[in-house]
Amino acid sequence: LSALQKQRVIYVLTHDSIGLGEDGPTHQPIEHVMTLRMIPNVELFRPCDIIETAECWTLAVENADKPSILALTRQNLPQLRTGGEMLSAKGAYRLKPADAERKVIIVATGSEVEIAMNTAKMLEEKGMGVDVISMPSWSRFLTQADEYRADLLPQDVLKVSIEAGTTFGWES
């Protein structure tokens, strides 16, 4: 109803991940993230660390005519970047540029960004250049200029997504 009424409501959801499984399969919401993204006039944020969480909270407060959802994990996650420019405002950004010629781009959201960073490190140790893109908000990323989106996700590079959920939607 808050989406239909264009209300500024901020929903804070926790336990967003299968990373902590001791609560059992009823607490592993693998389909929920994509389902929430599909609701019209709702912005879903899935931050990867405390910096992104603070940025996404600020963006949610600024959403005057629609509800926002912050999907947070219960896992202890590392801080992946320091402050500075509010990178989450673009929906996605290059968290880690390739150290060698870029061969792969890993796009990840939320707690899986840490997995992407660890994977990139392993691949780069084998000589493969890997960018890591953190995407806290799909909807914001899709509103960016074509040039920005093409710079982050060029056509001529292998792209891999990591999100603990359904693969629906990632094909785009």
Task: Tell me what each language-model feature is.
Residues 1-5, 28-30:
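Catalytic alpha/beta active-site cores
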Residues 48:
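TRNA-recognition modules of translation machinery and tRNA-sensing kinases, especially anticodon-binding
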Residues 3, 37, 61, 153-154:
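Alpha-helix boundary recognition
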Residues 9-13, 19-29, 53, 62-172:
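Thiamine diphosphate
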Residues 3-16, 35-38:
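A glycine-rich helix N-cap at a beta->alpha junction
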Residues 34-35, 160:
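Two-metal-ion acidic nuclease core segments, chiefly of the RNase H-like superfamily
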